[in-house]
Amino acid sequence: MPKMKTHRGAAKRFKKTGTGKIKRSKAYTSHILTKKSPKRKRKLRKAGIVFKGDQRRIAQLLPY
């Protein structure tokens, strides 16, 4: 059986942590930033964790 392919779009957006969780970046950070408060923009810089329900689906896209 041939090797499974990694979904390249998912590989650019998600990273696996050491404990097996999946990290993601937050949305709403690229433009229209003037109306967003500094506190909100600061919170958007921090990485988020993928929810349990979505984690299995994303893990299938990232086999390695």
Curated annotation (Swiss-Prot):
Gene3D superfamilies on file: 4.10.410.60
SUPFAM superfamilies according to UniProt: L35p-like (SSF143034)
GO terms for cellular component: cytosolic large ribosomal subunit
Any one GO BP annotation for this protein: translation
Region annotation Disordered: where it falls in the sequence: 1-44
Domain of life according to the entry: Bacteria
Residue stretches of biased makeup (Basic residues): 1-26, 33-44
Pfam families in alphabetical order: Ribosomal_L35p
Family: Belongs to the bacterial ribosomal protein bL35 family.
Protein name (database record): Large ribosomal subunit protein bL35
Keywords: Ribonucleoprotein, Ribosomal protein
GO terms for MF: structural constituent of ribosome
